[in-house]
């Protein structure tokens, strides 16, 4: 949308992409493209082409998969110190992910890690690299299934911290183990 001079009216609307599934929040890149997230769980349809972060050039509408960021139910990502931090909105418990690109402007290759968190000490360790085609299953195999003790409860937004030395994100779940 392009806003009018009054900030209240819309002077132009451009549709720049179609064909993506269950879109959620995204992020701007330092080089002028933007990222949109498919909040589509891999487990729902392993054969589907959905469940990716897509990088879109607003000038041309060109879109490409950021395959290095993994296939999962993406919520949002934030850039800090050259690495992308990714929230997963699959359900009650999930890990926080970190993508370290091989080339800062190419989100198709790099290493993907999951954070195994310890709530009792408020510390964690990055586990990986993970298989970007199935990061949730790979992380569960390497760190154990996500629980209230070692992961986070229903990620929502994520942004770079004010100091620029990390990220801030929110959880919207109850934090209690189901069942």
Positions of the model-derived regions?
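Sequence/structural signature of beta-propeller domains
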Residues: 1-179
């Amino acid at each position: 949308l392009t806003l009018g001079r009054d900030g209240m009216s819309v002077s132009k609307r451009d549709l720049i992409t179609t064909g993506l599934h269950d879109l959620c929040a995204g992020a701007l890149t330092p080089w002028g493209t933007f990222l949109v997230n498919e909040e589509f769980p891999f487990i729902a349809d392993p054969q589907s082409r959905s469940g990716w972060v897509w990088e879109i050039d607003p000038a041309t509408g060109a879109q490409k998969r950021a395959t290095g960021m993994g296939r999962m139910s993406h919520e949002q990502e934030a850039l800090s110190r050259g690495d992308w931090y990714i929230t997963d909105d699959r359900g009650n418990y999930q890990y926080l992910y970190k993508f370290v690109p091989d080339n800062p402007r190419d989100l198709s290759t790099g290493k993907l890690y999951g954070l195994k968190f310890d709530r009792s000490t408020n510390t964690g360790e990055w586990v990986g690299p993970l298989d970007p085609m199935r990061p949730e299953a790979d992380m569960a195999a390497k760190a154990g299934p996500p629980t209230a003790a070692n992961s986070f409860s229903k990620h929502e937004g994520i942004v770079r911290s004010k100091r620029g030395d990390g990220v801030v994100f929110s959880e919207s779940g109850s934090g209690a183990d189901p069942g």
